[in-house]
């Protein structure tokens, strides 16, 4: 199986991801914080472009950034199929070069957790601050420390259907609040035989106060911290933490 076809199957598996909720979160926060006239959005860690395309169809001028060339190929094809214009760039989120003056920057689907060094998170916040217009918003989510330390630790998740099945195993790393994801996919080909593909991902998260400190050091004002697509503050057992920060 080529990496291009793996990106295709990844996109299929992510169909159940809460894109409606992420899209609603963006539009709600832009309105809530007086940015109804916002037009330019940078979607960092855009993957196969699902959220970027949805936002573009709502009239936003969207730019997408991702490290994976193959994911971006799917994203570009998706944008063309939906007849929307989106600029896609293959970059590490610590770089973010070649564009500026955004009303809003988003980093969803725990993409920020792929940065394993504190310096990388801080650099990313600093670059985003430079790219935002005055009063522009940064919206992002991360895995909670509870999810990393309790739900993911030594966990195994499985899924099975006729076209694609996977085994997803999680192991702790030496870093605090970090995990290694070992994913094994079995995809059925046209001949009915299954082909195996292995993926390895590492993620790390930090305490909420640490993210707040880094945002403040980068120049941001933290407006709101909530959890799990609600308006409630994070609890000890929250799994996904959302931040809203303003330049």
Curated annotation (Swiss-Prot):
InterPro entries: Methyltransf_25, SAM-dependent_MTases_sf. GO terms for biological process: methylation. The keyword Methyltransferase applies. GO terms for molecular function: methyltransferase activity. It comes from the Bacteria. CDD domains: AdoMet_MTases. Its EC number is 2.1.1.-. Keywords: Methyltransferase, S-adenosyl-L-methionine, Transferase. The keyword Transferase applies. May be a S-adenosyl-L-methionine (SAM)-dependent methyltransferase. Belongs to the methyltransferase superfamily. This is Putative methyltransferase GWCH70_2453. It comes from Geobacillus sp. (strain WCH70).
């Amino acid at each position: 199986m080529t990496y291009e076809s793996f990106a295709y199957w990844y996109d299929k598996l992510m169909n159940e991801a809460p894109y409606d909720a992420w899209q609603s979160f963006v539009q709600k926060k832009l309105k809530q914080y007086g940015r109804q006239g916002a037009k330019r959005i940078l979607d960092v860690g855009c993957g196969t472009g699902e959220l970027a395309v949805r936002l573009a169809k709502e009239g936003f001028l969207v730019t997408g950034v991702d490290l994976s060339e193959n994911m971006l190929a799917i994203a570009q094809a998706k944008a063309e199929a939906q007849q929307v214009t989106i600029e896609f760039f293959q970059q590490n989120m610590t770089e973010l070069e070649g564009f500026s003056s955004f009303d809003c920057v988003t980093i969803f689907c725990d993409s920020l957790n792929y940065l394993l060094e504190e310096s990388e998170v801080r650099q990313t916040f600093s670059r985003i601050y430079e790219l935002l217009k005055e009063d522009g918003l940064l919206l992002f989510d991360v895995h909670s420390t509870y999810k990393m330390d309790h739900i993911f630790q030594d966990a195994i998740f499985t899924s099975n259907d006729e076209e694609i099945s996977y085994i997803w195993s999680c192991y702790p790393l030496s870093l605090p609040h970090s995990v290694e994801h070992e994913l094994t996919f079995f995809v059925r080909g046209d001949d009915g035989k299954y082909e195996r593909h292995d993926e390895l991902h590492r993620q790390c998260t930090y305490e909420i106060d640490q993210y707040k400190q880094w945002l403040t050091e980068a120049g941001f004002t933290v407006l709101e911290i909530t959890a799990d697509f609600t308006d409630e503050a994070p609890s000890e057992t929250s799994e996904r933490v959302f931040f809203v920060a303003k330049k």
